Amino acid sequence: MQAVTAAAAAGQLLTDTRRGPRCRARLGTTRLSWTGRFAVEAFAGQCQSSATTVMHKFSAISQAARPRRNTKRQCSDDYPALQAGCSEVNWDQNGSNANRLEEIRGDVLKKLRSFYEFCRPHTIFGTIIGITSVSLLPMKSIDDFTVTVLRGYLEALTAALCMNIYVVGLNQLYDIQIDKINKPGLPLASGEFSVATGVFLVLAFLIMSFSIGIRSGSAPLMCALIVSFLLGSAYSIEAPFLRWKRHALLAASCILFVRAILVQLAFFAHMQQHVLKRPLAATKSLVFATLFMCCFSAVIALFKDIPDVDGDRDFGIQSLSVRLGPQRVYQLCISILLTAYGAATLVGASSTNLFQKIITVSGHGLLALTLWQRAQHFEVENQARVTSFYMFIWKLFYAEYFLIPFVQ
């Protein structure tokens, strides 16, 4: 734009420059008079005015054509108000971008936290620890820990986790109204996730679980996934002959069969038979794990309904806590766990290996003592303490899987 303006001004300059000789020619050829429009003084004044105009235009052209250096400094010296305005605009734009990025970051973190709650992390941790512990039982020496074994373990774990998310997600989809009373912080009950989002997540993880199982080619793993799918669906889906969670015995049976029997037997067989290519044979630790986890899974199935008694009663869920009352169910759960720990201590004492005997006896004794002390401060009317105690039972569940490999 400056180049075009300079060219136009240069053309005008040439035109005005040519007017100088015309003025002189007219001065020599025109008859002069001392009065009137063509007086010498007036004519000379016009020529002088034209010359002055030419000089000003030439100066303007030179200024426009001259390259600007240190534009920032010139803007600062000549136009301080303009530079202040530019700085303010830049600051506003940077601040707006930073705020927008912070909002996006906050939204992403919020969605991740909601997804974390959607997965029911205490069940995820239980699945990870349980499958890891059971997968170690067939190992006889350090030579068994190979890349093939690691791949087989990861296939089983990933497929099981995807199925776990399907089961807990499906339960939340059918329990939205109940969870608004019992667990209002869950993403579907709170409205953080829409029903469409929940359906998408449930179907996606179901497909991933079966895809991994089929790709592995493991019959025990596929058996575990299919049974988990069937029982998890029957537990939650509202349909004739389904929605087994309405009935205390059927609900407890679903949880007990999956957590106590299926996890131990199916994943042990997967590692022993499919991965290590050894004949399937039960071990002392496998039998102990199955029997002990039957007791523990029954406790989890019964105790989980104590915090939910209000919502279950309102929606016709006939859990044992609704029928017998939370206090009686709580006392039953504590009795079952203490009995199981006593039996585990006797099993550990029968071990021929001194180190394993010390670990199993002292470990189960310490867990039983911790449970008894914690039970002294339990208040069934205090919702916060009931929920906290339920999560404490899950921690005992995790701890037991660390002791199971030492039972030989």
Curated annotation (Swiss-Prot):
One of its GO terms (molecular function) is homogentisate geranylgeranyltransferase activity. GO terms for biological process: vitamin E biosynthetic process. Its EC number is 2.5.1.116. Keywords: Chloroplast, Membrane, Plastid, Transferase, Transit peptide, Transmembrane, Transmembrane helix. It comes from the Eukaryota. Pathway: Cofactor biosynthesis; tocopherol biosynthesis. InterPro entries: AtHST-like, UbiA_prenyltransferase, UbiA_sf. One of its GO terms (cellular component) is chloroplast membrane. Its main location: plastid. Gene3D superfamilies: UbiA prenyltransferase (1.10.357.140). The keyword Transit peptide applies. It catalyses: homogentisate + (2E,6E,10E)-geranylgeranyl diphosphate + H(+) = 6-geranylgeranyl-2-methylbenzene-1,4-diol + CO2 + diphosphate. The chain crosses the membrane at residues 122-142, 156-176, 194-214, 221-241, 248-268, 286-306, 329-349, 352-372, 386-406. It is found in: Plastid, Chloroplast membrane. Residues 1-62 form a transit peptide. It holds the Pfam family UbiA. The keyword Transit peptide applies. Involved in the synthesis of tocotrienol (vitamin E). Catalyzes the condensation of homogentisate and geranylgeranyl diphosphate to form 2-methyl-6-geranylgeranylbenzoquinol. Possesses low activity with phytyl diphosphate as substrate. Seeds of most monocots are enriched in tocotrienols and contain only small amounts of tocopherols. NCBIfam families: PRK12887.1 (NF009525). This is Homogentisate geranylgeranyltransferase. The lineage of its organism: Eukaryota, Viridiplantae, Streptophyta, Embryophyta, Tracheophyta.
